[in-house]
């Protein structure tokens, strides 16, 4: 729906009488004023005219109107999107006979033939108006003609209707559809229903009328009558919301440093320098109260907040954090590395601002010395500079201490070149903390595995040894069996046979169907974005030095029918690869060319290539060690899911999931992902979920949500929500 060309009128109305409003959009522009080729010719024309000393003697040659008539012009079809009943909208303009090509602007709906469905009248520029008769059959409706006080048209009056358990409301407003006025009737589609449960008219003066004896499949007249009008009843007190944002005395605010990734990598799909902040919860001063650490961007120190007995969080200044503020904190784990009874800190450093191999990509380990004194140990962990994000903790070898999986997020300035991930085995002894990189011995496949964003330790086969799951951007979900702590074997093909690649951002586990094993929820980009993908039409990226200038270039592509095309246009593509301007002299020739015609089959075959086959966020149900995928509910697909929290929110014995996300820093030609306010996925205990909207749950998380953690505040359960370049949000769960 985001690409409806030059749109004018937009009408929401129930054209198929199923009780759900559809959307009709007129579009078209007489001259293509945004045509880049004409714009370039235009500059040449006016420069020639400006610099011609004999301009006044060449009026015919420089006749402006004649020149402007050369501006391209193309008639286009309008759009009718059918409401899929809380599952989005589907374009039906061809199927429903509305594929005439026109220059359209004004549009109205009205039941012109009084047969119970809405017809369309469309105004077309320099052409006859179009009248479309609606031939819907086997559906029911009810209509109302409202007569207000003193025989006036009661603009602003609302009609509330309940039928077969479904609620609808419409407000009488005539000015609709771009400089147009629709019929003064109010029209409700009823689908198969023939029984009305309740009709209430809320007049524009605030009074109400309850309507009885109205007839289905006809138009009913309702007249404002002082004798039948009663005042609105006072609203009952709203039910306590499950989620409630609480005020903070000294909230953490993430302060993203200014850096433009697109200066070096013009064709990136999104920034890779804005992936924070990290967030972790733990008791860092051994007072039995949860504290938290929030990661800083470059130039912002890591922030430690200690919980007081009254539930207030106080920021504590840690000198070593101030000293290390020029690292970017993208992953944090709080755990006792040396079994001395206090909590240490591991921080994964990341970002995209510096060259590969820079020391600012070295991870950091801070040993807890007690009394909130932390010291950085450069000998505790390998000083390998990899831009990371994900860290997960597990005693994979059951030797009594905690080991680490550390995910490589990216190779700076070489997107999407794969990064290496690591397994660090804890070899601490006698109070001396030491982690050894055992990736080569335990799981060599982690070398250059991809752009890792998330991991999870799960006992997949019930042998009591926790196995490793890894996922990321442009990756499939990878499953690695723990062979009794000795090493790991990939079992992806055995446990997830319908696996597909995505932009995975988070994995969480839980027994969502109450059958005794562990299921999974995975967050993906979602289905409400410019980029779309399927197995038949994958979304791809290619990496190569396409123009042979000793720098890597990337090309994003999509499939239309059986042909592959570049996502980005001539202008952006030529900024990265200037040779494109020489090969394609104008925008039209580039727009008409396939990917192979632009870059050649040979160089594409030689390129590093990844593809995505689905952007759906999914639930993976465990059936005796084999996972099957189910799409999460529609409202969980409206934006990407960056963070997932699993718990029984309402105490009904079934696990639920709280999901948050958004992606604000997309490339300039792609609107940002910002449709999520967070969603409570209420579990039914059978592997199903119902998405509860903010107005039902009270869960409202505006912004670019990056991380969420549960934290105990006195005797209450709260949710911490960390957002990029925004203040941390604290939400009480009632």
Predicted regions and their residues:
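Gly/Ser/Thr/Pro-enriched helix-cap/hinge segments flanking short amphipathic alpha-helices
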Residues: 66-79, 83-278, 487, 527-538, ...
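Solenoidal tandem-repeat scaffolds enriched in leucines and small polar residues
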Residues: 382-428, 432-458, 465-466, 471-473
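Blade-loop segments of beta-propeller domains
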Residues: 312-335
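Beta-propeller blade repeat segments, especially FG-GAP/WD-type strand-to-loop junctions
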Residues: 36-41, 77-90, 129-139, 301-316, ...
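Beta-propeller blade termini
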Residues: 8-17, 105-112, 275-286, 306, ...
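Asp-box/WD-like beta-propeller blade repeats and closely related beta-sheet repeat scaffolds
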Residues: 325-331, 350-396, 418-419, 436-444
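Acidic/hydrophobic-patterned starts of short beta strands in beta-sheet-rich repeat architectures
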Residues: 18-26, 114-123, 286-296, 339-348, ...
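Short, conserved, GDST-rich strand-edge loop motifs in beta-rich repeat architectures
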Residues: 29-72, 348-360, 407-419, 523-537, ...
């Amino acid at each position: 729906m985001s690409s409806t060309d030059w749109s004018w009128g937009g009408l929401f109305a129930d054209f198929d009488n199923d009780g759900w409003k559809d959307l009709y959009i007129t579009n078209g522009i007489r001259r293509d004023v945004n045509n880049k080729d004409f714009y370039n010719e235009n500059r040449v024309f006016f420069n020639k005219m400006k610099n011609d000393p004999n301009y006044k003697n060449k009026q015919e040659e420089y006749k402006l109107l004649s020149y402007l008539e050369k501006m391209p012009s193309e008639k286009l079809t309008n759009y009718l999107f059918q409401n899929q009943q809380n599952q989005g909208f589907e374009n039906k303009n061809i199927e429903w006979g509305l594929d005439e090509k026109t220059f359209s602007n004004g549009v109205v709906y009205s039941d012109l033939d009084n047969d119970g469905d809405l017809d369309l009248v469309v105004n077309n520029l320099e052409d006859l108006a179009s009248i479309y008769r609606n031939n819907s059959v086997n559906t029911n409706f009810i209509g109302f003609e409202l007569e207000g006080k003193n025989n006036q048209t009661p603009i602003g009056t609302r009609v509330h209707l309940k039928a077969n358990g479904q609620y609808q409301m419409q407000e009488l407003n005539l000015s609709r559809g771009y400089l147009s006025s629709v019929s003064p009737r109010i029209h409700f589609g009823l689908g198969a229903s023939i029984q009305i449960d309740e009709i209430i008219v809320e007049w524009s003066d605030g009074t109400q009328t309850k309507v009885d004896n109205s007839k289905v499949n006809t138009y009913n007249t309702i007249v404002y009558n002082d004798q039948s009008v009663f005042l609105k009843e006072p609203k009952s007190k709203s039910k306590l919301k499950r989620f409630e944002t609480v005020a903070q005395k000294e909230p953490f605010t993430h302060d993203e440093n200014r850096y433009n990734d697109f200066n070096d990598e013009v064709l990136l799909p999104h920034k890779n320098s804005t992936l924070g902040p990290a967030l972790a919860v733990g008791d860092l001063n051994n007072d039995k109260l949860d504290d938290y650490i929030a990661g800083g961007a470059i130039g912002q120190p890591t922030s430690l907040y200690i919980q007081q007995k009254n539930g207030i969080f106080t920021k504590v200044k840690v000198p070593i954090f101030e000293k290390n503020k020029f690292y970017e904190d993208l992953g944090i784990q709080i755990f006792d590395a040396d079994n001395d009874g206090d909590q240490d800190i591991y921080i994964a450093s990341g970002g995209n601002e510096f060259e590969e191999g820079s020391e600012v990509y070295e991870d950091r380990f801070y040993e807890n010395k007690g009394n909130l004194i932390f010291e950085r140990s450069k000998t505790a962990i390998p000083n390998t500079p990899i831009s990371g994000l994900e860290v997960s903790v597990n005693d994979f070898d059951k030797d009594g201490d905690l080991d680490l999986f550390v995910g490589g997020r990216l190779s700076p300035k070489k997107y999407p070149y794969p990064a290496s991930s690591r397994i660090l085995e804890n070899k601490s002894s006698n109070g001396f903390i030491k982690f050894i990189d055992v990736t080569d011995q335990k799981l060599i496949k982690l070398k250059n595995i991809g752009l890792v964003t998330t991991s999870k330790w799960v006992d997949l086969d019930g042998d009591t040894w926790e196995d490793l799951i890894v996922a990321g951007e442009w990756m499939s979900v990878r499953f690695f069996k723990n062979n009794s702590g000795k090493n790991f074997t990939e079992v992806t093909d055995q446990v997830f046979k319908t696996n597909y690649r995505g932009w995975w951002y988070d994995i969480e586990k839980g027994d969502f169907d109450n059958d005794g094993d562990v299921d999974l929820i995975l967050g993906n980009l979602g289905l409400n974005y410019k980029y779309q993908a399927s197995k038949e039409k994958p979304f791809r990226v290619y990496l190569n030095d396409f123009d042979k200038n000793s720098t890597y270039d990337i090309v994003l592509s999509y499939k239309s029918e059986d042909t592959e095309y570049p996502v980005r246009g001539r202008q952006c593509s030529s900024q990265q690869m200037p040779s494109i301007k020489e090969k394609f002299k104008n925008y039209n020739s580039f727009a008409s060319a396939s990917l192979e015609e632009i870059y050649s089959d040979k160089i594409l075959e030689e390129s590093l290539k990844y593809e995505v086959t689905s952007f759906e966020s999914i639930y993976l149900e465990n059936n005796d060690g084999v996972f099957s995928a189910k799409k999460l509910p529609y409202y969980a697909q409206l934006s990407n899911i960056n963070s997932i929290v699993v718990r029984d929110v309402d105490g009904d014995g079934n696990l639920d999931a709280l999901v948050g996300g958004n992606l604000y820093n997309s490339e300039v030609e792609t609107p940002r992902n910002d449709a999520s306010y967070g969603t409570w996925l209420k579990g039914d205990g059978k592997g199903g979920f119902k998405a509860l909207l903010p107005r039902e749950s009270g869960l409202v998380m505006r912004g670019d949500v990056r991380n969420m953690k549960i934290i105990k505040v006195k005797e209450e359960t709260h949710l911490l929500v960390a957002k990029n370049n925004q203040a941390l949000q604290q939400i009480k769960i009632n």
